[in-house]
């Protein structure tokens, strides 16, 4: 019977260790005092256009929330990328919203070149009562195509 008790206690300790990892993982998903979560993605569209979607969740009602800058990179081989263009929220006001809990939009659609690869580095932002938080997110690369139904995310 003692073996069963040892096995039971060992199982409980193992479960506690696994749960502590889950709690640690959850704690790291909260980005900052103002950013609850954030992500961005690129989507190939028709005629080699690329859409940039940004999703930013605030920790409450934010004075300002969205993306401050979006850096777009281009490659012919999906290995060697160079900076193609920078989008700034000062020039593209659709990249930022005011007095909302979250930001979810596709503020930028740019013209790509069929066969070329693109990824974006997005600086997300949230501000409330004079305090603010900024974090960065890098998307997966996608390939521009004249026929996006055959385009897949490049890994």
What do these predicted regions represent?
Residues 19-34:
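Sec-dependent signal peptide cleavage junction
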């Amino acid at each position: 019977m003692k073996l069963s008790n040892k096995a039971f206690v060992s199982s409980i300790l193992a479960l506690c260790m696994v749960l502590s990892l889950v709690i640690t993982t959850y704690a790291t998903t909260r980005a900052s005092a103002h950013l609850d979560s954030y992500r961005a993605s690129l989507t190939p569209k028709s005629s080699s256009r690329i859409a940039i979607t940004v999703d930013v969740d605030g920790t409450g009602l934010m004075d300002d929330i969205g993306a401050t800058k979006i850096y777009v990179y281009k490659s012919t081989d999906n290995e060697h990328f160079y900076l193609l263009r920078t989008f700034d929220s000062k020039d593209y006001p659709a990249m930022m919203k005011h007095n909302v809990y979250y930001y979810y939009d596709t503020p930028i659609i740019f013209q790509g070149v069929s066969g070329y690869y693109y990824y974006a580095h997005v600086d997300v932002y949230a501000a409330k009562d004079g305090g603010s938080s900024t974090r960065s997110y890098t998307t997966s690369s996608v390939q521009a195509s004249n026929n996006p139904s055959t385009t897949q995310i490049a890994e």
